[in-house]
Each structure stands twice: as structure tokens, then as C-alpha cells.
Amino acid sequence: VEQKKIDTRRRRYMNRQVYNPFLPLNEYIPDGEPHVWGDRVYHYGSHDKEGGYTFCMQDYVVYSAPVKDLTNWRFEGITYRASQDPAYPELKYMYAPDVVRGNDGRYYLYYCMGGDYGYGGYTGPISVAVCDTPAGKYEYLGHVQYKDGTVMKKYICFDPAAMNDDGTIRIFYGTQYGYEE
């Protein structure tokens, strides 16, 4: 009986649509990470599909606006698709990304993927893609690694936040239980 109540609440929750006041009504970007580069604000985040059966599905999109006019948002397009990650081509869910400008002037997209219907089924390390512009087409670069070059896989990490701290790129992330490599 308790499980039935939980399932009913979950279905009711997943059937509600929440709207963002500055995006078109069919667009949803949770886990937002706004960044100012040049004279524009760029809004990164997960991407929910209108009427989708779950969340964080298949791609990332970016919107931007002039710093001095946050009522004038522009759709920059799809910047990265799940299918571009060669390590996990079968995974469809892309969670809470972040972008940082590197010391070389390029932009680095940090993200994690999963395959368990958007309910925290994280299955791999944090990945990174790179682009020459904040809202261009990002290309897969690899996985986050330790200084010795080994992929950071001791823990299942998710929702990376990245920053450039006076030339040192720092990544903060959530984690679940560890697993053996």
C-alpha cells in the first residue's frame, strides 16, 4: 500500500510542467549555470524535453543575453549531444553540466551521463568536451583525470561545477557510493 502511494506521487510529479520565465514555454533548462563572458550572459544546464517521459534527455542547449538586457535571450542551439561521447554511446541522460574558460581561452564543458531513466543512474566518470566559443559546437575531449593521467573513477561522480581559480581549474562534484574499477 505504501509503495502504491509513492508511485502515485511520483507519477503526479512527473506529469507537471514547470515554466521558466525567460525561456520559451516549451524549453526547460534545470540545474542552471549562468556565466558572463564578454558582454553576454550564457545559461548552461540540463535540458528537459517538453512532454518528455523523464528529464535530462539527449543534449545540452545554450541561451544567451546581453549583460545589460536580460529580457532579450537568444537560443544559441544544441551545443552537445549524448551521442557525441564515444565512451558511452548507449547512454541517453545528461546531467547538470558546467562550463569554464580555460587558460588557453577555450571553453570546457564538464558533464556526466547516465542510463537509468534520469533517476541518478550515473554510470561513468565526469567527461569533458571543448569549444573555441562559449556557445559553439563542443567536441568530446575525454574524461577528468588525476595528475598521473588515470581516469577519476574511484567514486561515481555527478553534477560537476568548474571554476578557473587564477589559472588553476577546479572541479567540485557530488558523489554516490564508490565502486571497484
What kind of feature is each model-predicted range?
Residues 2-181:
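Carbohydrate-active catalytic/glycan-binding domains of CAZyme proteins
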